[in-house]
Amino acid sequence: MSRVGKMPITLPAGVEVNVSQGLVKVKGKKGSLEQKVDSDITVKVDNGEIHVTRPTDQKRHKSLHGLYRALIANMVRGVSEGYKTEQELVGVGYRANVKGQLLELSLGYSHNIVIELPQEIKATATAEKGSNPKLIMECVDNQLLGMVAAKIRSLRKPEPYKGK
């Protein structure tokens, strides 16, 4: 069996899980998330634990088993604790401003870059004198947060020699 897949997911207090027709819905104090699950993988909720099982030991089933177990575990952690990421803008004259769901970045180009953040993400920008500006983003969905952080990083990749 998959090492990741065979471990049960323990539910923290205040987290509800509903499984119906290949859809797993997780609801907690920070929000709610849902994930479609492949028809071959079964998800069961028993006395405070979630068990993910597969029908056979085929390679496809093994890979899906660990994948869905990890995705559901990330959902449970997200709705109970949430996810947070910090990005530091290293460069001369780099700035970040957050106005509602609009993120305005000054990254050394001739123009400012404006990004509309998804509604689920809460962002703040801090700039202390004498240090690099920091962008702090929080969200319940780990995948969405990672995609937005990667998009922001791709706008101005670090220089390969010093990493700035």
Indicate where each model-derived feature is located.
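N-terminal intrinsically disordered, cationic/polar leader segments
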Residues: 2-164
